[in-house]
């Protein structure tokens, strides 16, 4: 669980997302409240429930990106799901309880990784011993083993090929579908999971370079040092106390006020979400999970439906509402220059692999931002995603000819942008279909 302050969380999000101060502050406070709750006495801790968040804003303004970056910061079990993937209980498809089962799966993997890091030093020593045994043989004297250990540490043996017995990761048992539960993996039953330990311990012989064998062996030795029961217990506790679920596209399961007739994937899904968000117990293959203290962050563009079209009970369970504003031309300039993962940096690096040096001038960046904002206004506002389209069109010719232009330097200025995009931007009909 992260112990970053709200200010630190916001400044971390600022590295990747421009603007949207309210949304960043809301998720930062929600994340910090998880830490605050952990500091409370046990009896009070159970009474403090998370305040779930509803993010409202047009497409392409950073809702999903906030969730993605939050997942990396949280150091807590986190899952992002689209509400449109689920159907009402009783119909073919995934029901919403699968969200918690997927969250538990993610938590097990995350917890195992953290615990592996804790025993890595001991696992490294055991892996080293196995490599030395493979090179020097079982009966080698201590002096010989020490000689090989020194060579191993100096890197002299990195290219030596050795034969090792490593765990066989292939699943010996097939998966089969449970009748009446078709579709996806949700109706699949893995016999390997059922019979678990009966098939554990299967090994296979592999020839590997010493340098390549280390990670495999360290992973194996770390797993031997871990207690599976403790991993499961710790992971389930982390899900119950610190889990975060990001529900994207929540507006797509709104039944519009003027719509008529039943819709399997809409109102029923909302009804099924109610107990999940309020607090219920979901059974998973690792054990039951209480969802009372899991934080839910829902988001949607609400382009056609309105937040008031959600079931009143669901609105009540998402008490904190945050509006994200549409992006302006100035925002696009900042997105292209200030973020750590700016498209300008990405294209410069991509062309650099072909030995073509690309540089962007301020007027070139301003031209890109202006075109993106203009097309968003005249055609359809898809936010920052429009920059992908514009950049791809500008670089189309260069991307194709880059291998033949090795060693050249290309400057992306207003003239370069106009040459590659001018005709399209002047014709609204063309930009409607191409940009």
From Swiss-Prot:
Alphabetical GO biological process terms: protein unfolding; proteolysis involved in protein catabolic process
Molecular function terms, GO-annotated: ATP binding; ATP hydrolysis activity; peptidase activity; proteasome-activating activity
Keywords: ATP-binding, Chaperone, Cytoplasm, Nucleotide-binding
Residues involved in ATP binding: 18, 60-65, 248, 313, 385
Classification via Pfam families: AAA (PF00004), AAA_2 (PF07724)
Predominant location category: cytoplasm
Xref: InterPro entries: AAA+_ATPase (IPR003593), ATP-dep_Clp_protease_ClpX (IPR050052), ATPase_AAA_core (IPR003959), Clp_ATPase_C (IPR019489), HslU (IPR004491), P-loop_NTPase (IPR027417)
Cellular compartment(s): Cytoplasm
Family under the similarity heading: Belongs to the ClpX chaperone family. HslU subfamily.
Subunit structure: A double ring-shaped homohexamer of HslV is capped on each side by a ring-shaped HslU homohexamer. The assembly of the HslU/HslV complex is dependent on binding of ATP.
UniProt protein name: ATP-dependent protease ATPase subunit HslU
Lineage of the organism: Bacteria, Pseudomonadati, Pseudomonadota, Alphaproteobacteria, Rhodobacterales
Gene designation per UniProt: hslU
